[in-house]
Amino acid sequence: KSHGYSFYGELTYSEDYTHFNYVNPDAPKGGEISLAVSGSFDSMNPYTRKGRAGALSTVMYESLMGEQLAGTGLLPADAYGELYGLVAHTVEYPESKDWVIFHMRPEATFSDGSPVTAHDVLFSHNLLLDEGLKSYAEAIRKRIPSAEVIDDHTIKFTFSKDFSRRTMIEQVGTIPIWSKAWYEKTGAKLDESRLEISPGSGPYIIKDVDVNRSVTVERNPDYWGWDLPINKGRHNFDRIRVEYFADTTAAFEAFKAGEVTYRTESDPKNWASAYDFPAMDRGHVIKEELRDGSPPPMSGIVFNLGSDPLKDKRVRQAVALAYNF
């Protein structure tokens, strides 16, 4: 039994950890952060290919083991390949990893006040198999032949011995947990586009959805997990607002005009030359590089060998010689 799981050995944080090292556990809470994105949306269900889901449409859902909001990565950010209990307080598994048992926190509740139970976890797992992407369902059925509720706050997953089991604890530990009662009451389908939002157990709730214009979420004052070590120093904004714009140029202009308050710049050319506008000159905009210590994602250049220049073997050889390895 353990309070977390690591792909690579010992956990960085002990069972009695109080917060992650990179957070301020006493960080002030309040205010609003607004972000700009380009594009449009017509749904708040990101688990289907039908329609286009809005920003923050997963922000209210939690999992047994901790993930960053909206599925942006595992927690903690300073310990790669590690997971710590969120809705589950303990994870239990043998050395062979043939199975895993999650022991859940009885105090966990959905935003409508109903308890989060192992029945909801099993329902969510089965819903993904029955109504999720077919490719996902086919792969998971082969790897997880059975899942069973032991009691209201304990669930067991059994893994196939025909596949590597190292990542399977992460797989089942990070599936979103949905309310079984809500789905049964409303008849909602996971594979259908919809704007109706099921209750989640997370620190934020969807406050307002203006299709193709904005999505606003607010901190839930009744959130059950504020005092958990995994949440200390996090979820500090009272409101997060995402504004939609027709394209990236319009989104940048909105930032320059002060309509949105935060922007992540990924274009080197913009970073070097586009930040010369009145608000910047007045000191109302802080331009700062943030060090990212996480392992970089894989990137590459893909050549279209059907193009006329690359049909020439000598050109391909010249391109290969340009690389210093």
Spans of features found by a protein language model:
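Short, well-ordered beta-strand elements
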Residues: S2-G4, G30-G39, H89, W99-F102, ...
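N-terminal lobe/hinge region of extracytoplasmic solute-binding protein
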Residues: S2-S96, N126, P199
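Aromatic- and charge-enriched surface segment that lines or borders ligand/interaction sites
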Residues: Y13, V23, A27-P28, T48-L56, ...
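Short, solvent-exposed loop/turn elements at domain surfaces
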Residues: D26, D42-T48, A55, T72-L75, ...
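Alpha-helical secondary-structure segments
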Residues: S34, T117-S124, D152-T158, G202-P203, ...
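Gly/Pro-rich hinge or "lid" segments in bacterial periplasmic/extracellular proteins
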Residues: M60-G85, Q171-R241, A246-A250
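Surface-exposed binding/hinge segments that line
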Residues: H103, A137-E184, P203-D210, G306-K311
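Extracellular/periplasmic solute-recognition and catalytic clefts
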Residues: S146-E148, K207-E218, E243-S307, A318
